[in-house]
C-alpha cells in the first residue's frame, strides 16, 4: 500500500473555457464544480491532481484547491508562467506542478532526454523569472508525459516512458 494516494481528474474540456462555445460558463461555477470533486478526494485522505492537456487559465485549478496541476508542458509550457501568483499559492500549500514535458505524439520520435532537458530548464527559468524560487520549482516538480499514451504504438509508448524516466534523473 502507498503512504499517499493520488487521484487524478482528467479534465478534457477546460481548455475551451472562455471560448465562444462556452461563453455562458462562469469562472466561479467551474471553480465550484472542480472544488466539489477535489473535496471528495480529500475526504478520503488522497491528494487531488488535475490533468488538462490543453491550454487553460491555470489559476482555476489552484483556486479549486487541487494539489497537483498536471499540464502539457511540451506544447503549453510557457503558459504556466502567466500565473505566478497562483503557482506561489499552490506551492505555499505544498502543491506540485506535474510538467508533461515528454510528448505523447509523433513528435516523440524527434525527442530525447538531451533535447528535452534544456527545454525543461528554460521553462523553469521562465517561471523563476516571475519571482518564484527556482529551487522550490525544482522541489515541487513531477516529470510526466504530456498526455496519455493509449493511442500510441507500444514501441512509441515505451519510448515516452523511457525518456520520462531518464529526464526525471537529470
Model-derived features: positions:
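Catalytic-face loop-and-helix region of soluble metabolic enzyme cores
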Residues: 64-170
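Active-site loop segments of alpha/beta catalytic cores
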Residues: 1-84, 103, 111-113
Amino acid at each position: 500500500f502507498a503512504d499517499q494516494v493520488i487521484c487524478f481528474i482528467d479534465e478534457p474540456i477546460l481548455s475551451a473555457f472562455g471560448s465562444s462555445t462556452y461563453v455562458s460558463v462562469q469562472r466561479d461555477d467551474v471553480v465550484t464544480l472542480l472544488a466539489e470533486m477535489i473535496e471528495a478526494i480529500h475526504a478520503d485522505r488522497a491528494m487531488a491532481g488535475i490533468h488538462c492537456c490543453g491550454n487553460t487559465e491555470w489559476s482555476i485549478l489552484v483556486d479549486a484547491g487541487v494539489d497537483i496541476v498536471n499540464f502539457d508542458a511540451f506544447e503549453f509550457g510557457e503558459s504556466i508562467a502567466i500565473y505566478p501568483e497562483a503557482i506561489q499559492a499552490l506551492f505555499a500549500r505544498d502543491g506540485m506542478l506535474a510538467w508533461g514535458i515528454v510528448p505523447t505524439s509523433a513528435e516523440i520520435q524527434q525527442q530525447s532526454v538531451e533535447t528535452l532537458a534544456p527545454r525543461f530548464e528554460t521553462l523553469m527559468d521562465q517561471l523563476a523569472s516571475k519571482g518564484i524560487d527556482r529551487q522550490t520549482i525544482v522541489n515541487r516538480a513531477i516529470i510526466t508525459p504530456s498526455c496519455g499514451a493509449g493511442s500510441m504504438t507500444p514501441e512509441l509508448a515505451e519510448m515516452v516512458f523511457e525518456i520520462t524516466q531518464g529526464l526525471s534523473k537529470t
